[in-house]
Amino acid sequence: MTIELRDVSYTYAGKYQRVTAVDTVSYTFQSGTMYSIMGASGSGKSTLLSLLAGLKLPTEGEIAFDEQPTRFMDRSALRRDTVSVIYQDFNLFPLLTAEENVCYPLRLRKEDKDQALALARQRLADMGIRESYFRKLPNQLSGGEQQRVAIARALAAGSYVILADEPTGNLDSGNSRMIVETLQRLAHQEKRCVIVVTHDPAVAAAADVQLRMQDGRLTQEEQQEEA
């Protein structure tokens, strides 16, 4: 999976004038790689993530998934089949159990109920969630467990692209480390394209490619050195 941004800009109406949140960004993201994006509040990070998720369309330029521009795609299908977003607040359905939350994208695709449940349970186990927790509601789980359920849902969906918005923001150091290691595994072993927006330098440093948003522009790329 290749995601190409071609002179992408996004503007919106401010109180007194139009505001440019993303300014003429050109970049190519590849599968098998973990990227981090840092930047100050208001630098355009979250807007860029929304553009990549198909939640917004560029005001100028285009974003293409394997050469197919998003403006010509069914963006609901894009989010259902290609892109998963992991949020800082987990974004789990409060009245669904852990396994039901993981099953949700599979049920949207009308996959066989028993097969969907089996896959959901396998992905929860892959994330270190004990079987006795599969039927717990989100408010019965710790923050780290809820984030692992959210990642299990992205895994079960089979998404090629994982967008993570401050995925460790509410977690302690131990859970943060586990989440980062999981994202690395998704990129390196399962060949997903993983893009992480973070304010944590340690999380950013764990990425293969480190990027920075400043005044709507994507800058300061650093490639990790091979050991």
What is the predicted function of each stretch?
Residues 38-40:
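The feature captures the beta-strand-to-loop junction immediately N-terminal to the Walker
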Residues 61-70:
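Conserved ABC transporter NBD signature motif
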Residues 70-84:
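ABC ATPase NBD coupling module
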Residues 137-141, 145:
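Conserved ABC ATPase signature
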Residues 96-103:
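Short coil-to-helix segment of the ABC ATPase nucleotide-binding domain corresponding to the Q-loop/switch region
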Residues 114-132:
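Conserved ABC ATPase "signature" region
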Residues 53:
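Helix-to-loop junction immediately C-terminal to a conserved catalytic motif
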